Amino acid sequence: MRKAYNVTLNRHDAKILKKYLHACKIVFEASAYFDDIYFTMYLDKSEADLVNEFLEVL
C-alpha cells in the first residue's frame, strides 16, 4: 500500500531529489512557491526507506 509523503526543499536540493526520484522510477508531484519546491511522493515502505536515507545525506 502506498502512502503520500510531503517534502519541502530549496531549488538546488529539489533538482537533485528530482533526478533521484526519476532514476528510481518513483511517482511524485512537484510544485513551486517562491524559492521552495514542494514534493508529494506516493511511496510504499521500501521506497520510503530509500528516500529517507537519500534525504538524510542531502
For each feature predicted by the language model, list its residue ranges.
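N-terminal acidic leader/helix
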Residues: 1-38
